[in-house]
Each structure stands twice: as structure tokens, then as C-alpha cells.
């Protein structure tokens, strides 16, 4: 908050310290709390991308509480053996990762061309995790 910074006569050299969340001192040596001269920023957005990967629970801590999780879903659960051999995931497995990670939204993509109807991926994933969207060509998403 520039008005408050001017009011406290904080040196320009200290702006970087304020941006880092640190307290500073004014020209008279008085300590100025960071919260007294700054405004709260907006919450950062988060997005994680897990593609060309087999079902791998150890990745969960790395995508914990993410807003938007893109996860490949190359196969359906009926073809889980093929998924295991080719080191890809099923829609259900992607949903399990999203659920365990407490993601807000799951975006599925990287579908095998063997499936003509892609809505089955969304339906399979929704048996585990409700907020599922298909990453279809040309679709954009806002985080």
C-alpha cells in the first residue's frame, strides 16, 4: 500500500523486503510490521499435470490440494492390464489420485484412440471423484 509506505517514510531499498513479507524500519529506526503497510494478495492458483504415467500413489503429495489436476486416462478400467503393460492410467485410477490428493477439479486427457465414445472416461472417473471434465481439443480452462 503505497500511501501507508509513504506515511511511514519507508526507504525504497526496503520495498523488496516488504515484498518478501519481512518487517522493516523507518528513517527513525522504528520497526514497521509488514502487515501495517501491505495489503493481502489474492490466493495463488494451482495446476498439476500428470501425463504419460502409470497409476503411481507416491505422486499424491506432490499434487496435494491442487485446484486443477490434469491426469492422463489412456484406458478404461476394463483394460487395466493393458494400462499396466504400457505404463498408462485408467480413468478410475486418475480419479483415485485426484480424490487422495483432494484436488478441486480433475481434467482427463490422453485417451487411447481405441475408444470412440469419450464420455465413458468421464463416467468411470465420476464413480470415484465427482468434479471431472474431459480435455477435448479446442477446449480452454481457467484456473
Report each predicted region and the residues it spans:
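Active-site-proximal loop/helix segment associated with metal-binding centers of metalloenzymes
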Residues: 1-49, 53-61, 68
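Binuclear metal-ion centers of metallo-dependent hydrolases, dominated by the metallo-beta-lactamase
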Residues: 55-143
